[in-house]
């Protein structure tokens, strides 16, 4: 028999197998730590009370379940209590094995374990518990979900919706050992997508946001409005906030003539392209920060659910596994997700029956999108932020899209939108309470990327979409657009789901490869979407469409792709006589911005012209109703890469401050008018604000100064050259 080398495990042993499989050693260590973790957690009165309460609630739910599920029976209530205790012990002991099994198969494994692990553990508990009879696995599967529904309902009634217990249980499942204490403060930046400063001020005064209201009333934090320049959209604002540069983002979607492609920032490849142009390696999160659920990474070394990062290669789903295998994670969120979809159907019908105007049709597809993004992904985001707080991450930036998502479809000040805002406030309160037990002190900064404006859509008001109006006027000018692209969809509503699907595509292994091919069409492909291989440069190709109308809220960029470069007003008038005057006089259009060969950028209204370069106004100023920053915003926007041949902004209703979106959204942002440019920043009161905050790039510089104030960013490398983009 051969002698094994000293200290080398025998070939036939489990340790020997682990030695030959590097990834397995961690799994074996996890298996050994499972029971140790369960017994090592310190016990105190609060934990004892919480544990006893959890056992009683789960036992009550299971007693009810056994009485309604065929194939299940128990002789006495104490047998059920014993089964609950056994299930808890099995869950704690098998956690590392379940996590390893899930990770071996990537996201599919995680989801399968999330769906079936609770049922399998409950089935084992039934089998080994005396005097409980179960007719196979499927009665146990049904019982696991019915009991979960009852448990969630009871827990919600007992806790009044507080999420602290949910988060603490998940963190116990994702325990990462003791982290040394650090004195240097960390910073958690929470973006509440689409929240306007006036709305937050009202919500604080009303007390409907207890956490933020308490901070501001107590004087620990200060509310500072900031101006989101045109275009007030998430990609432009996040490029500015996270990378300090948004000059290459003229809208949510735009056309690049030199490459013959439509860029849509909610597409992962396009988001990656945008970040490559914006990043210099010194983004907001470059100093060991974490990006969670954003469009761009901010140069963070670690990012999750970040749309631009999908092309960086696969990452293991270990950070997600605790959420999906915990009975307090995926099971709870899945049930609440279904409830959210039902709530959306009810609220949409109620809005319709009450005759609330303006409103849009809220489809079943949106109900599913809302349910996934506002429950499942919000819970997942919260767990990820909490995990990195407990690991002592230096800085964390997370975007919560709950409010923005609902406000687009219901209206920014409608009841269901405000309820979503209250939910985000609860999350902030939970994270702040958790941070008190973190290995370093944390400061919280809350901000928005833009606001929202309300109004009936352009199509609702005038019976036809903007692209049809432009096409009709071109035909009247003797040059009908026989081939055109109308980019006026609602891809922004799918952005949170796109982030999740992009994360799925990142996973290693067989399942990751399969999912990458199957999900490509879902998260990427659409007519005219960005394709790097299409970039040719030079003159536009003959087969290019005659017209492209790319809408972002109540702002539209109009391109004539068969004419290379950006057309001047004189060239447009030559090619399409009368088009500019007809557009400027349309009742649904507030103004048209174009560039002249003599005066540079000008704004045309139905009764006047505003020359942006000189400030000279002829007739009635078309920007008079749009606020004091309008001219400066448009002058800056005119210098953006790939801005349209024409920039069209909708009308603004003087009595209500409502706009007319060129997309089918009742709440919108992207142009001028209403609250869409009035973003907000809530920060520690002791942190000074160095002047008026105009634009996301300015806010980025302020955030960087604050990070430097607490000791961050001292060791960052010099900036790298940005990727240039032709105009």
Predicted regions and their residues:
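Active-site nucleophile/metal-coordination loop of metallo-enzymes that catalyze phosphate/sulfate
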Residues: 197-329, 333, 478-515, 519-525, ...
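Active-site-proximal N-terminal segment of extracellular/periplasmic enzymes that hydrolyze or transfer
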Residues: 167-220, 461
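Juxtamembrane/disordered regions of integral membrane proteins
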Residues: 2-138, 153-162
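His/Asp/Glu-rich, glycine-adjacent segments
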Residues: 161, 165, 244-411, 553-560, ...
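Active-site neighborhoods of enzymes that stabilize oxyanions during catalysis
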Residues: 266, 270-279, 285-288, 292-299, ...
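Metal-dependent active-site segment of extracytoplasmic phospho-/sulfohydrolases and closely related
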Residues: 425-463, 601-604, 609
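Acidic, His- and aromatic-enriched active-site or binding-groove loops in soluble protein domains
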Residues: 243-256, 317-320, 385, 418-426, ...
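A long, amphipathic alpha-helix that forms part
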Residues: 375-376, 380, 388, 396, ...
């Amino acid at each position: 028999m051969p002698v094994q080398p000293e200290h080398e495990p025998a070939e036939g042993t489990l340790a020997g197998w682990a030695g030959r499989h590097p990834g397995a050693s961690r799994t074996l260590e996890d298996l050994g730590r499972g029971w140790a973790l369960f017994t090592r957690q310190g016990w105190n009165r609060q934990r004892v009370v919480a544990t006893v309460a959890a056992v009683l609630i789960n036992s009550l739910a299971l007693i009810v379940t056994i009485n309604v599920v065929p194939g299940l029976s128990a002789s006495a209530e104490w047998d059920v209590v014993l089964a609950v205790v056994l299930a808890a012990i099995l869950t704690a002991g098998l956690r590392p094995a379940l996590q390893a099994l899930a990770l071996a198969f990537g996201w599919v494994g995680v989801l399968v374990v999330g769906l079936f692990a609770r049922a399998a553990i409950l089935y084992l508990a039934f089998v080994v518990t005396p005097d409980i009879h179960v007719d196979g696995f499927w009665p146990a599967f049904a019982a696991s979900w019915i009991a979960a529904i009852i448990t969630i309902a009871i827990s919600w009634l007992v806790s009044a919706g507080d999420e602290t217990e949910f988060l603490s249980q998940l963190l116990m499942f994702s325990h990462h050992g003791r982290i040394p204490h650090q004195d240097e403060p960390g910073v958690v930046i929470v973006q509440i997508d689409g929240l306007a400063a006036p709305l937050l001020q009202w919500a604080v005064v009303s007390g409907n946001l207890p956490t933020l209201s308490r901070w501001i009333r107590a004087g620990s934090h200060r509310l500072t409005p900031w101006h989101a320049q045109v275009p007030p959209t998430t990609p432009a604002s996040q490029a500015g906030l996270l990378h300090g540069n948004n000059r290459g983002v003229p809208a949510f979607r735009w056309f690049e003539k030199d490459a013959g492609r439509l860029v849509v920032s909610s597409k992962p490849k396009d988001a990656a392209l945008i970040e490559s142009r914006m990043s210099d390696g010194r983004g907001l999160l470059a100093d060991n920060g974490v990006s969670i659920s954003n469009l761009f990474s901010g140069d963070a070394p670690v990012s999750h659910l970040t749309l631009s990062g999908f092309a960086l290669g696969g990452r293991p789903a270990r950070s997600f596994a605790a959420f999906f295998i915990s009975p307090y994670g995926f099971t709870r969120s899945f049930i609440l997700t279904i409830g959210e979809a039902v709530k959306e159907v009810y609220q949409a019908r109620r809005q319709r029956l009450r005759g609330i105007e303006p409103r849009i049709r809220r489809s079943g597809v949106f109900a599913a999108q809302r349910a996934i993004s506002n429950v499942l992904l919000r819970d997942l985001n919260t767990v990820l932020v909490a995990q990195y707080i407990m690991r002592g991450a230096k800085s964390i930036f997370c975007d919560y899209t709950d409010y923005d998502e609902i406000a687009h479809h219901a209206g920014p000040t409608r009841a269901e939108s405000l309820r979503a805002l209250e939910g985000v406030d609860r999350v902030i309160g939970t994270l702040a309470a958790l941070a008190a037990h973190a290995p370093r002190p944390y400061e919280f900064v809350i901000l928005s990327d833009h606001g929202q404006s309300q109004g009936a859509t352009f199509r609702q008001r005038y019976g036809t979409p903007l692209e049809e109006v432009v096409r009709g006027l071109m035909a009247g000018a003797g040059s009908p657009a026989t081939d055109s692209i109308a980019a006026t969809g609602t891809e922004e509503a799918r952005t949170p789901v796109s982030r999740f699907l992009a994360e799925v595509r990142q996973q290693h292994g067989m399942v990751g490869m399969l999912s990458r091919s199957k999900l490509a069409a879902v998260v990427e492909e659409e007519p005219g979407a960005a394709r790097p291989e299409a970039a040719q440069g030079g003159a536009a190709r003959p087969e290019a469409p005659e017209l492209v109308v790319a809408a972002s809220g109540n702002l539209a960029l109009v391109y004539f792709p068969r004419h290379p470069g950006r057309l001047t007003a004189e060239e447009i008038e030559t090619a399409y006589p009368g088009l500019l005057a007809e557009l400027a006089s349309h009742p649904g259009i507030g103004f048209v911005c174009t560039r002249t060969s003599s005066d540079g950028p000008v704004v045309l209204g139905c009764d006047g012209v505003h020359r942006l370069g000189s400030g000279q106004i002829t007739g009635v100023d078309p920007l008079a109703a749009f606020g004091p920053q309008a001219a400066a915003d448009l002058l800056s926007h005119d210098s953006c890469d790939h801005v349209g041949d024409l920039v069209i902004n909708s009308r603004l209703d003087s009595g209500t401050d409502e706009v007319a979106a060129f997309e089918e959204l009742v709440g919108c942002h992207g142009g001028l008018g209403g609250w869409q440019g009035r973003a907000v920043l809530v920060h520690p009161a002791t942190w000074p604000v160095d002047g008026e905050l105009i634009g996301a790039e300015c806010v980025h510089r302020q955030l960087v100064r604050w990070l430097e104030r607490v000791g961050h960013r001292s060791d960052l490398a010099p900036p790298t050259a940005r990727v240039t983009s032709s105009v």
